[in-house]
Swiss-Prot record:
This is UPF0235 protein Mext_2130. It comes from the Bacteria. Belongs to the UPF0235 family. Transmembrane segments: none annotated. GO terms for cellular component: cytoplasm.
Length: 105
């Protein structure tokens, strides 16, 4: 059974992301497993990792893809790292269903 790149919290859902900045296009690459064995959502953005541009592009892309407001997607950790944790605010079960649908499963 494949592990999920997200965990349910009382106030929403925490999504583990591996971000590739300065990509040719912004998009979702699917779920991958890091060397530590932790599953992460692999995403790419066209924005460079300069002055928070890639992080802003990431939160905007995730919000748009899941039908959320930008304010409902918060960067919890990984501001200067490729591995990040995002908090998606809202009903955890609804958010989990949206993420699963986005991942195609």
């Amino acid at each position: 059974m494949t592990q999920s790149p997200f965990t349910l919290e009382a106030n929403g859902l925490v999504l583990a992301v591996r971000l590739t900045p300065r990509a040719s296009r912004t998009g979702l690459d699917g779920v991958r497993t890091e060397a530590s064995g932790r599953p992460v959502l692999s995403l790419r953005v066209a924005a460079p990792p300069v002055e928070g541009a890639a992080n802003a592009a990431l939160t905007a892309f995730v919000a748009k893809s899941l039908g959320l407001r930008k304010a409902e997607v918060t960067l919890l950790s990984g501001e200067t790292s490729r591995t990040k944790r995002l908090l998606l605010s809202g009903d955890p079960q609804t958010l989990a269903a949206r993420v699963e649908a986005w991942l195609g499963g």
